[in-house]
């Protein structure tokens, strides 16, 4: 992978998640079920959070000048809009759509998720400004959008895609999955009784990789010690989502477990493999 893309990958992964989020999730686990409707839309809370980004722009003259050229949606003048950041500079471009979540009764959780989305967009825009400053040359393209992959009466899973291109391309997918009835942001470890899921899921993914390569010679996964970065195990907080039919899907970024041409890779984990490890059948069946 291109060294610059590797740096962008690490910096994006290091975007700090609000400290309050873990506490909020724990609180939400104890809340009584409530009925509500959740939609994706820029919220007043998210708009208020734009102050954070405005401060960043005011500190950086190049950023301020660039932001003044961004198409504005709504009544926010010369400031970031949470729908889209779009700019072209020389032969580089950025197009970042920032999602905002609304409809949760737990506003602390809702605001923390939106703050996380905002920080991610800040980091992407910061990288764009730094990489396209006057003393630097090169073509950079950053594109980010989002989509709802699961929307049932109980669950909402949202995928945010980030594609960075500079000589070569690198694609990431990030998910959040929410229990809409109970206002809970689900984490991978929260679905299981203990840490045994890490080993069990990792082993199943390896078996799926081997089977796929056996059936299709064009597919390659990094599994052997001869590979530069062989896949050993998933992370405790590995990227995941839950499908509409309540199946667990584990996701890997481009280059994470396979060559770039394989793109973002996903593995659906058979429920029978993990059923005895689950805390219950509410989410995974």
From Swiss-Prot:
Enumerate the subcellular locations listed in this protein's record, separating them with semicolons.
Cell membrane
Membrane topology reported for the UniProt record: Single-pass membrane protein
One Gene Ontology term, aspect cellular component: plasma membrane
Which regions face the Cytoplasmic side of the membrane? 1-37
Q: Which residues lie on this side of the membrane: Extracellular?
A: 59-285
Q: Which UniProt keywords apply?
A: Cell membrane, Membrane, Transmembrane, Transmembrane helix
Q: Which residues cross the membrane?
A: 38-58
Q: Does the keyword Transmembrane helix apply?
A: yes
Is the keyword Zinc-finger in the record?
no
| Protein family per UniProt | Belongs to the RsiV family.
Q: How does it assemble?
A: Interacts (via N-terminal region) with SigV.
Entry function? Anti-sigma factor for SigV. Negatively regulates SigV activity through direct interaction.
Tell me the protein's name.
Anti-sigma-V factor RsiV
Lineage of origin: Bacteria, Bacillati, Bacillota, Bacilli, Bacillales
């Amino acid at each position: 992978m291109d060294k610059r893309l590797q740096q962008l990958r690490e910096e994006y992964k290091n975007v700090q998640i609000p400290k309050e989020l873990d506490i909020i999730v724990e609180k939400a686990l104890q809340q009584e079920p409530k009925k509500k409707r959740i939609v994706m839309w820029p919220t007043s809370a998210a708009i208020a959070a734009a102050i954070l980004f405005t401060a960043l722009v005011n500190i950086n003259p190049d950023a301020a000048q660039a932001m003044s050229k961004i198409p504005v949606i709504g009544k926010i003048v010369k400031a970031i809009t949470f729908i889209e950041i779009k700019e072209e500079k020389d032969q580089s471009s950025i197009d970042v759509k920032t999602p905002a979540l609304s409809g949760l009764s737990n506003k602390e959780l809702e605001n923390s998720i939106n703050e996380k989305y905002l920080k991610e967009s800040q980091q992407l825009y910061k990288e764009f400004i730094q990489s396209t400053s006057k003393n630097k040359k090169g073509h950079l393209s950053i594109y980010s959008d989002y989509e709802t992959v699961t929307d049932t009466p109980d669950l909402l899973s949202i995928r945010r895609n980030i594609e960075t291109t500079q000589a070569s391309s690198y694609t990431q997918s990030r998910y959040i999955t929410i229990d809409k009835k109970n206002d809970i942001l689900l984490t991978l470890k929260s679905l299981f009784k203990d840490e045994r899921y890490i080993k069990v899921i990792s082993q199943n993914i390896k078996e799926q990789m081997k089977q796929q390569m056996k059936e299709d010679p064009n597919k390659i996964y990094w599994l052997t010690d001869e590979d530069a970065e062989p896949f050993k195990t998933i992370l405790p907080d590995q990227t995941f989502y839950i499908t509409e039919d309540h199946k667990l899907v584990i996701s890997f970024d481009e280059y994470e477990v396979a060559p770039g041409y394989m793109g973002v890779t996903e593995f659906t984990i058979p429920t029978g493999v993990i059923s005895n490890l689950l805390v219950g059948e509410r989410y995974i069946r």
